[in-house]
């Protein structure tokens, strides 16, 4: 509750509340949380936030770094998948993002990342080498 993550209702399942619990979060809230984590401005020790950041590191393109996390809520209809994170530029600029999409079948899982990379590339934020 102290971070204000979504509706802050984690219910009783502490190991997967973000997938099957009562927790609800908007894309705007996801982006805000990702930005706060990227800038270590959440109400947690900065060293802990740095450890989480390191766990979310995906790849580097040039000097830009991509950090992200995917997820798939399968207990709702329609099922929802997301790819949320941020790009860190060498000058320290942070661009947080989230992609939420309806999930249907197997290929949708890989499409989340590719769609996000395509948009970040087109916006000139993270050039993806194909």
Positions of PLM-derived features:
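Structured C-terminal helix/loop/strand segments within mature extracytoplasmic catalytic/sensor domains
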Residues: 33-130
């Amino acid at each position: 509750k102290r971070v204000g993550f979504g509706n802050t209702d984690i219910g009783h399942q502490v190991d997967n509340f973000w997938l099957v619990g009562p927790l609800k979060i908007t894309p705007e809230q996801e982006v805000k949380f990702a930005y706060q984590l990227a800038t270590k401005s959440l109400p947690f020790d900065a060293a802990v936030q740095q450890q989480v950041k390191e766990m979310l590191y995906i790849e580097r393109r040039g000097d830009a770094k991509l950090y992200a996390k995917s997820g798939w809520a399968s207990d709702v209809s329609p099922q929802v998948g997301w790819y949320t994170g941020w790009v860190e530029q060498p000058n320290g600029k942070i661009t947080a993002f989230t992609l939420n999409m309806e999930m249907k079948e197997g290929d949708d899982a890989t499409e989340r990342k590719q769609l996000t990379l395509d948009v970040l590339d087109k916006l000139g934020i993270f050039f993806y080498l194909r």
